[in-house]
């Protein structure tokens, strides 16, 4: 679905055909900033109405994590709020497999 890297606040758009996707993120200190400082907040918003749907993380300092989003198929916006950190976000569509029937 997508991969983004950056610093500071950004709005990232994506479209999920299933409404199910996994977000993975990693943050590290920006050059010249305190290695233990910084803040990273990631929320998922509707790309249609703009309303917030889910808060993914609100972390202090560098780190990483993953979060599964389950919603209706639609456009989404990822809202990034970041201070003092370089971030990378990867979004992958989740495909649900069903056992074969005989």
Regions found by a protein language model. Give the residues of each.
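Acidic, Ser/Thr/Pro
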Residues: 1-102
